[in-house]
Structure formats: C-alpha cells, structure tokens
Amino acid sequence: QNDVKYSRLVATAACRQATNGRDFIKRVRKETKLKLEIIKPSEEARLAVIGSVGHLKAKTEQVLVVDIGGGSTELVWLDLTNVEPKNRKNSIMLMQSNQLRRKELDKLTGVKVVDWISVPFGVTTLKEQYSDVEEDKAAYAMMSWSFEEYISHFGPSQSDDLKILPNFQIIGTSGTITTIAATKLGLQRYDRQKVDGYEMTSAEVGLEIDRYLTGGPEWRAKNPCIGDSRKDFIMSGAAILRSILRVWPTNTLTVADRGLREGILYSQMVKQGFLS
C-alpha cells in the first residue's frame, strides 16, 4: 500500500530468551509474510547507541549508553578522544556490531569500544526474579544489589580515573529513564518535547527514586506518568538505573526518548546511502 522499498523488522531479548522464540518468528512469517529477525545482543546494543547519538555533546570524550529494556539491559562504553569533536556523531553512526564484540579501536572512525555488556535482566525479567518478595523497599534493594553484581566487572571501575574525566556523559534510553524525567518535571501528561534531551545528575535521579519508594505502590499508581500498570515495573527499572549511577556517578545523564527504532532507521539510511 505504501510502496515500502526498505525495511528491517527485529525481535530482541524476549525472543532470544523464549524457548519458542524461533517458532514465533516462523508463525509471524507464515501469517503476515513479514520477516522478523532475532538480533544478537551486540547488534541490539549497537542500534541503541546509533539511535541515541543525536544527544551526544560536542565536548564528550567518554560516553556510556544505557538501554534498559524489558528482557535485557545493554551498556556500551565508548572512548571518543581520538575523534575530532565535529566528527564524533557521524563516526558512531558507522559503528558495526563486530566492532562491539571485539572491543577495539576502529582505525577508520577512531571510535574505541572500551567495553559493552548485555545483562539478561530488564524491567520485566528483574521484577519476575523477585516476584516472591512482597515488601516494596526490600524488593527494590534486592533487585538493585543483584544488578550491581552483574555489572561489577564492566568498564572502568570506581577506582579508575573516571572521577577526574570532565567530559564524561551518560545517555539513557528507556521507558524507565524517560518516566523518571517526566515525574521530576511534574508533568501531568507525558510530553516527549520536554523529556527528550532533558538532563539530570545522579543525585537528582536518586532523589526521584526515593520519592517513588516513600510514596509506595499506591502513590506511583496515581502518578499520571506512571500509572497502575507500571507501578511495579518502574521500580525494577529504577533499581537498574540507580545501580549504574552508583558505580559511575555523573552530572550529565541525558534522557533519550529514542533508541532501537531510531537506530534501525539511521543504520538503514547509512546502508542504503541516504546518510553519509
């Protein structure tokens, strides 16, 4: 009907982890004629980075991209010190997933992958892991501790020189992070224009999460930017985010209401020659 010439349809952690993931892909193909592709964690991470690159600051030399999904969380740490500031966004756009897997310096673009990880916990899977813990604050504490254990060997540790790096930026793309920004802004209805690109410090994120814990499930259910259906899931996402910020505190967490979908679009445009 719309004469689509180029498309890419992907499935992520849910299909990777499901025992019948391949059967689901075959059923979609049979019933809709659409070809779904179960992408690897490295490709999911690459697309999340490309999709959020628009929020990269010109002065940023070290960037950590955080993508909190439903079934997994991707973290990608890039060193951009070998790239001219004006070329940094375009250089990231040219990243390939095999570069992530090798964790190396790309001689063509100058982008260095310091580290990357795909943690098999997202907002849904982490919540399910502790579904038997009824007390709100206890469940949050256990989820936070569990996730922090997973990332203990990722990237530069607290003992490294990160504290003295002035040009460090975290870009966060997920419903958790956009929701925290929206409630901090006091929005009565979610507004992408106000949230996308909004910046918070680690301390501000911590205070907002504390407000979620103090208010409890009932308060979260009544908040227009959270709601009853997400009152529990927001806490598993908050536990993930706070664990990351506890290890790598920052004054610049940039909220990205963009990610995987935009990454697919941009990468396809590069592939087809529409972006150079």
Language-model regions, residue ranges each:
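Active-site loops of AMP-binding adenylate-forming
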Residues: 81
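Helical "lid/coupling" subdomains associated with nucleotide-phosphate turnover
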Residues: 1-4, 13-62, 77, 85-276
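Catalytic cores of RNA-modifying enzymes
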Residues: 66-68
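Acidic, divalent-metal-coordinating active-site segment for phosphoryl/phosphodiester hydrolysis
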Residues: 70-78
